[in-house]
């Protein structure tokens, strides 16, 4: 056993334990107090903490001939280093672990909508400028020889044929594909697990709430989420506009992850989560709430159609049941949080947040127009 190897190396653990049990050695103490099934790796880690080792001992790989070591355990032994690097230990005060994520959620949501308001202001200014620039460009194009069959021209034609919503989510899809490719780089596995999966038991709590929204490990998971996002992109951008949609989408990713944190802390079912499902549930719920009579169909089963309102009710019911019953295949708390945020925003949030952005826009306008002038100096 690994514990036996530690005792023979003479690191002082045997003496520390022997004095408290009347001279019994570590091996005798372990045999008396510990059932055989607890002499595995987890128990060794517990003993290590109690003995106060400053340096983790070298891990001893189980041999094939060791009794009590199954073939499955031997195959998994090669995974011990990366698994140990990603073991999550819940805080002894789990409620405290939600304080930083709560402040991050509120702060990020405010920054997202504030940035979106400024973005919209800048977009309106650039559109006015581009209108006059376009008149000049059209005149130059009329006298400039045109290139036929140019690849760039074909790309521009394809891009211009997309709707505003499709052009908006193209960047989101590209970011998800990039992160999916990064998961395939072995040297980045620890970084990806640390920053691109959300877990309230992790040491890094805040940044994964946003980054995990763009993270997918499974190709099918990513393809399904991006298909739904692409399908609803035109509708949601027509309802909210490009800038407001981006603020809602990014905020939804953080909010749904915070609800997931709350659910995991409340139930004690800790584990990493990733994916854009929470943010996409916000998009789906917002569209279904705004257009409840719209007709939807299931992919690969287009003959079965149903109203958007009924689809939303079914999804909420399923995620509520999954959260209560402890289904582990999906992060139902994140799905439910995203759906409720989408319903709330199109019902109340648009009036409370977006329509009250004017004071911020005026401040930004003052900064832009009354900034420091060039060529100053004393008179």
Curated annotation (Swiss-Prot):
InterPro entries: Peptidase_S54_rhomboid_dom, Rhomboid-like_sf, Rhomboid_protease_S54. The modification Phosphoserine is found at residues 65, 70. Changing residue 79 to E: Abolishes the beta cleavage. It catalyses: Cleaves type-1 transmembrane domains using a catalytic dyad composed of serine and histidine that are contributed by different transmembrane domains. It is found in: Mitochondrion inner membrane. It is a multi-pass membrane protein. Changing residue 277 to G: Loss of PGAM5 cleavage. The chain crosses the membrane at residues 102-121, 168-187, 208-230, 245-262, 273-289, 296-318, 333-354. Its main location: mitochondrion. The keyword Nucleus applies. Residues 53-101, 188-207, 263-272, 319-332 are mitochondrial matrix. Changing residue 76 to G: Abolishes the beta cleavage. Pfam families: Rhomboid. It is an enzyme of class 3 (hydrolase). Its EC number is 3.4.21.105. One of its GO terms (cellular component) is mitochondrion. The keyword Iron does not apply. Residues 1-52 form a transit peptide. Residues 122-167, 231-244, 290-295, 355-379 are mitochondrial intermembrane. GO terms for molecular function: endopeptidase activity; serine-type endopeptidase activity. The modification Phosphothreonine is found at residue 69. Belongs to the peptidase S54 family. Required for the control of apoptosis during postnatal growth. Essential for proteolytic processing of an antiapoptotic form of OPA1 which prevents the release of mitochondrial cytochrome c in response to intrinsic apoptotic signals. Required for the maturation of PINK1 into its 52kDa mature form after its cleavage by mitochondrial-processing peptidase (MPP). Promotes cleavage of serine/threonine-protein phosphatase PGAM5 in damaged mitochondria in response to loss of mitochondrial membrane potential. This is Presenilin-associated rhomboid-like protein, mitochondrial. It comes from Homo sapiens (Human).
């Amino acid at each position: 056993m690994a514990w036996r190897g530690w005792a023979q190396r003479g690191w002082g653990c045997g003496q520390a334990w022997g004095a408290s049990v009347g001279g019994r050695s570590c091996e005798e103490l372990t045999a008396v107090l510990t059932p055989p099934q607890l002499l595995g790796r987890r128990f060794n880690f517990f003993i290590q903490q109690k003995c106060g080792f400053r340096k983790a001992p070298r891990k001893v790989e189980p041999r094939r001939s060791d009794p009590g070591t199954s073939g499955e355990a031997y195959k998994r032994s090669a995974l011990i280093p990366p698994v140990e690097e990603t073991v999550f230990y819940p805080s002894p005060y789990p409620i405290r672990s939600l304080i930083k994520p709560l402040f991050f959620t509120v702060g990020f949501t405010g920054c997202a909508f504030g940035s979106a308001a400024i973005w919209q202001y800048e977009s309106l200014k650039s559109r006015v400028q581009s209108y006059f620039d376009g008149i000049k460009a059209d005149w130059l194009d009329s006298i400039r020889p045109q290139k036929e069959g140019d690849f760039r021209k074909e790309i521009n034609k394809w891009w211009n044929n997309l709707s505003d919503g499709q052009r908006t989510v193209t960047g989101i899809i590209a970011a998800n594909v990039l992160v999916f490719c990064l998961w395939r780089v072995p040297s980045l596995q620890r970084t990806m697990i640390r920053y691109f999966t959300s877990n309230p038991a992790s040491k890094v709590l805040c940044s994964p709430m946003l980054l995990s929204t763009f993270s997918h490990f499974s190709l099918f998971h990513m393809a399904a989420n991006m298909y739904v996002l692409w399908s609803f992109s035109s509708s949601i951008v027509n309802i909210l506009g490009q800038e407001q949609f981006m603020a809602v989408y990014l905020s939804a990713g953080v909010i749904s992850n915070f609800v997931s944190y709350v659910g995991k802390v409340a139930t004690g079912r800790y584990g990493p989560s990733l994916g854009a499902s929470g943010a996409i549930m916000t998009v789906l719920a917002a569209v279904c709430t705004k257009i409840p009579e719209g007709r939807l169909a299931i992919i690969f089963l287009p003959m079965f159609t149903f109203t958007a309102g009924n689809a939303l009710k079914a999804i909420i019911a399923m995620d509520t049941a999954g959260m209560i019953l402890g289904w582990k295949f999906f992060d139902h708390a994140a799905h439910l949080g995203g759906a409720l945020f989408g319903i709330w925003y199109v019902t109340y949030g648009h009036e409370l947040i977006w329509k009250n952005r004017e004071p911020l826009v005026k401040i930004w306008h003052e900064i832009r127009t009354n900034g420091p002038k060039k060529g100053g100096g004393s008179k």
